[in-house]
Amino acid sequence: MRRIYAAWTLVAAAGVMDCSPRLEKAAAFTLGPDSQVIVFPFMFQGYNIAVLPTTKYGDLKGNARRRVASFLEHNISHAVWYFVVGGIAYKDDRSERLFSEMMDGYLKKISAGASKVYKGGRKMFSESLETVHEMIFECNKAGDGHVVKYGKSIINRLSDMIENALGEVSAEEKRKYRRFWSRVKERAGFLYSTERLRRVVEAEKIVCNACKEICLELEEEELMGLLAEGSVRKALKAKVDEDEISRGLYLECTVVNTSLLLDAHREHGGDVTRELVKQMLLGKKGEEIDRRYINKVANVVKERQRSEMEKRDREQDPERRRLRARRVGSL
């Protein structure tokens, strides 16, 4: 079954970074059973890049440093949660209380820890984003990490709601009620699927590392030309006025088949996955990347590598001939 996950957009309110519930559904994603929202390690303010994957805390100056530090300390974990998981739990007051009891403090603690480490100056932003994913979706060997426990609690809560459907309503209303909550329950099963949680973390690492390498390879002007307008920015433009966009910090993301991405990395290596990520940054939709497209990209990368090797050989040949001539002349 296909699923809808609501994204969470971060906006500035009175100069303070704040999660804005009214923008919760600014960007919605339709996911297949192996698809997942992956967050790019770039932070945007308005139409400009505020933080690159390679940005360290010491690279930030003045107001930008304060705003980014505030975002990391108060918002980063909640932003990742709402991108990756969506609004599964927020369908009634009891589910919302369960989130507040089990997840809210947990996410705040992770944000505070990630902010403290980032401000230590050694980590790049991409590395901090990886760490946040690892800490939120950690799965120990026993398969009973915090999110897994929360997922099981949500499932129990939903099972009770389905079993004890509304009393004084028609049979048709009960049927619709049970069908709706059964779908929500199916979506919530993601939270205690340790295999899927591990895929989320592994895929995020691949994307973060690829973005970091792309940034290290390109000049700033080239990088600005590389980044296409993403889904979150498009959604913001449709929902929010220009002034609010210019003041807000937000992350970009895409939907990708994590199984295919991980398979591509194992089969073809980092050069191919880096090219796949580059194409997504250029505007290729992650959900359009299938095996056929991956093989096409792999062939292009292989041909490029072959051409570069031939070029290096041609450039080295004259030097080799000169060295050979010198050796012969000295005999």
From Swiss-Prot:
Residues 305-331 are annotated as: Disordered. Residues 305-320 have a biased composition (Basic and acidic residues). InterPro entries: DUF3654. Residues 321-331 have a biased composition (Basic residues). Belongs to the UPF0329 family. This is UPF0329 protein ECU01_0080/ECU01_1530/ECU02_1560/ECU04_0090/ECU08_0010/ECU08_2090. The lineage of its organism: Eukaryota, Fungi, Fungi incertae sedis, Microsporidia, Unikaryonidae.
